[in-house]
Structures are given as structure tokens and as C-alpha cells.
Amino acid sequence: RSEDPQDAGAAGRLRVVAPSWHEALSCALSTAGQIAFTGNTRDLFPVLRSGGCRFLPFEDCLREALAARGIAGLVRHDPVDGLSLSPPHEPALGEALAARGIRLGQGGAGPQGLRAALPRLLGEPEAPLAVLLDYASRLVQGDPGARDALLVAIDKAVRGPAPRRTRAHADAPRRNPLIWMLDTPGDLPEWFAVGNETLSHISVPMPDLEERFGFAGELSGTFSDVLAMDARELAARLEEFALEADGMTLSGMRTVAAFAEAEGHGLAGIAEAIRTWRIGTRRNPWKSSLMRARVARGREMLAARVQGQDDAIDRTMAILERSVMGLSGAQIRSRHARPRGLLFFAG
């Protein structure tokens, strides 16, 4: 998708769609017993419902995508809290797990508890479910032998017999999938990941222009100055927010929106708020009186160092003066409105 509003269309026509990793997940559920997610997994994502679009954390968005494939239950595990059922869930699922001797809570937090529970979870016949290993890069620390033993147990569980589906769950994937949430793809050892046909890798990208624009609209209620804007100005400001937030997560946009309102920038000053958030200071060096004074003396300073190149000095001073005085856009708050390029000095 293009990041240029000229290509993407007017702000009012931008449309948020389901995250791109949804389609990759749907395919992987049909072909792989385990799926490894890396990338921007700690962000917010659009969830499309009949009442509109909501932006939810990854786990909630994952649960919606699994439900669309007939997987109603999500059992999550992390090294601190152990096994738990991701809400909302059917009460019957918790009862079925208890009947199979699967301990929820901190009792299943360690590698031994996970090793004991996984074969029963992945072979659960009563209802299709998925197992999410959150913070999977931290499952076993400091003991390569224990880590390898756990991975071998996981591999055996994934390759074990698939549960027998009842007719009511015939549309669900044949296997209960195991889902990894990793910091980086290299967190799984090479011997386990390379050539493993049961493992599918999915990288979650940063939000694109449409997602940022849609979330900017979601955040518009944060700003008090939107009450004085008409529809055209509001759309332009939201588009500016989306463009300025290029490279940011949606969670970062939410943080910046709260910062902009607290600092008195409002939506109209969102570009300045983002500039401050990116560089970590309110100071703008292009507004410095000392900088302007140095540019005013720039010809004298350059002429003392560069001999016989008056034309080069003239052109250099023109660029610097336009940058500082506001004619080139180099000091403009808006990043996407600035000219881009480099000035090389050679000789």
C-alpha cells in the first residue's frame, strides 16, 4: 500500500481492513501444527465487526481470527502465570480441561508443567482450541538441556495423533494449533526451526497508512480542539496525524495523542508533538536565535575556509538560509511536507 495520500486517495476514502497476518494465519492453520509470530505483536490491531471497527490487542485480535476458523477456545501460557483460558470462553471448555487433569494457573508455569499439559491440550477432542505460548523466547533461561528437552516434547506433541473432530466441529482445522509469540525469529534454535514442516513463520508488520488513519479517527475524541473543526479540517488533521506517524505503532500513536493534549498542542499541533516524542526534547534547534546568527555570519566563515569557490559558497548559503528562515521546509514541523535530500561538500 502506498504511503502517499495522492496515491492512497483522499482521507475520507481510506478504508481499514483486517490485518494482513489474518490471511497468513488462515492458511497456516490448514497446513501447519505450530505457528511462530514475530514482529509487531505488542501493538493494537483493527477488528472488523458489524457495528464498525475496533482496535484491540494482539491476543484479542488473534482470538477473533481463530473463532472465524471454528476454534472457539484459546489457552495461553507464559512463564509467570502458567496456563490460563483467554476470556471470553465457554464454561464447558474449562470443565473439559479440568477433567483431563490440566492444571490452570501457576502450577503449569514451569517447563515440566507445560510438558505435561501440551499433549493433552493439543489432543483435546471435546472442542477445537489453540495453545498460545506468550513470551515464548523466555520459556527456559540458562539451561540449554532443559530447553532442548522441552522443544523435543513440543515437537512430539505437535506430531502426535490429531484429535477426532465431532460433526459439529468438522469445519475447524484438523489439529489444535500451537502458537508461538517470539521476540525474533532466531529465538527458536536452528535444529528445531529449520526444515520443520510443522512450523509456519508469520511476521507481523508495522501499521500501514490506512490503519494509522483509522486509528487517528479513533483517537480524535482525545483532543479538545476537534470541537471547533469542521469535517474538512478534521479529515486533513487526521491525515496529517497518520502521515506524521509513519514508522510508529498504534500504541505509540495513542501515547502521542495523550501527550499532545496534555501539552496543549491538540490535534492541530500533532506534528510538533510527534517531533518532540521522537527526539525526546521540546527544543527545536531550527528556532534557535544562535543558529540564525551563525547563518547570518555564514558567508564570512565559509569564505575564510573555502578559497576560489564563490559560486559554491553562494549556493551553500542559499540552502542554509532557506533552511533556517523557513523557505525550504527544513524547519517545518511536518516531516512529510519537507524536501528530502543531502548536501555533499567535496574538495
Residue ranges, per PLM feature:
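Extended, compositionally biased accessory segments flanking or bridging domains
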Residues: 1-149
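Conserved nucleotide-binding/hydrolysis micro-motifs of P-loop NTPases
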Residues: 41-44, 136-139, 184-188, 207-211
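Alpha-helix termini
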Residues: 121-124, 160-171, 223-228, 326-334
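Residue-level recognition of the N-termini of beta-strands and the immediately preceding loop/turn
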Residues: 129, 174-177, 339-343
